[in-house]
Amino acid sequence: MRNPNIFLALYVTGSWIWRQRMPMAQCLKSCVCSDYEPLVKDAVQLPVVDEGRVTAAVNVVKLFLPDCLSVDDVLKSRDELKKLAQARNISKILAKSATAIHIARGIKCPKGTENVLRQTLVDNCTVFKSMYSVLAYLYLSPGADTDGMIDQVVAQTADRTIMLGDMTVLSHAMRVDGVDIPHSSQDLAKMGLSAADSDTLDPIQLVGVMEPPSPPPHTADAREDAPHVSPPERRPQSSATLTSLDAKSRRGLAGQVPAS
């Protein structure tokens, strides 16, 4: 005779498997093929093209390229677009040079290094003028061949160009909280502004970069070699002359007083 408990156990187990068939299938699916699930087409949204922005961009390009009437014309004008990109790079260099010159007007540097900075600023002004000329040439000469010209100008002036970052670092090194601070010769040597064995007196005196150079001091030898000029003799004036001068000065002061 068969044991009825076996049939009861099989019935309960089969019922539980039947009730858990969907969760088990999803579990197997997530473990085996989760990386290969197909995308739901309804959830994919294509980017919406803003025609207003496209039209505005075309209108901006038309300011520089009057012959372009559509986006296709702009894409075909690769040479003109290259020229515009070059002009944009030159404009960035011009902006940095102008800002560096403007910042240099208010900063101070250790005495003895102002000549180097002044010469650098002069070279920077030369770069500014050269780049401005090239930029004007690009805008005023449509269809001109500019290959190599800009690279040549940049190569000739790159080693002499002082940029905004250099001026900002220098200005920050010379000032703390808006107050000029003195530097020792060792500090200047660490910043690469002077040699460590230079005969520089401490503390370093700060001078303006844009200030005109002071005239050289007169030495004792120069004063000895200079011809001696005696001061003019002062002749004694009579009392009548002094009285007349005193009266004239009083009348002059009376004429300068505004009438009430």
Swiss-Prot record:
> For this UniProt entry, what is the primary localization, expressed as one broad class?
virion
Alphabetically sorted, this entry's keywords are: Host cytoplasm, Host Golgi apparatus, Phosphoprotein, Virion, Virion tegument
Which spans does this entry mark as compositional bias, Polar residues? 237-246
Record-linked InterPro entries: Herpes_UL51 (IPR007625)
Among the Pfam families in the record, one is Herpes_UL51
Q: Where is this region: Disordered?
A: 208-260
The name of this protein is: Tegument protein UL51
What function is annotated for this protein?
A: Plays several roles during the time course of infection, including egress of virus particles from the perinuclear space and secondary envelopment of cytoplasmic capsids that bud into specific trans-Golgi network (TGN)-derived membranes.
Q: Which GO terms describe its cellular component?
A: host cell Golgi apparatus; viral tegument
Subunit structure and binding partners: Oligomerizes. Interacts with UL7; this interaction mediates UL7 incorporation to virions.
- Please report the organism this UniProt entry assigns to the protein: Psittacid herpesvirus 1 (isolate Amazon parrot/-/97-0001/1997) (PsHV-1)
> What residues form the membrane-spanning segments?
none
Q: What is the similarity comment for this entry? A: Belongs to the herpesviridae UL51 family.
Q: Where is the composition biased (Basic and acidic residues)?
A: 220-236
Q: How is it modified after translation?
A: Phosphorylated.
- Cell location: Virion tegument; Host cytoplasm; Host Golgi apparatus
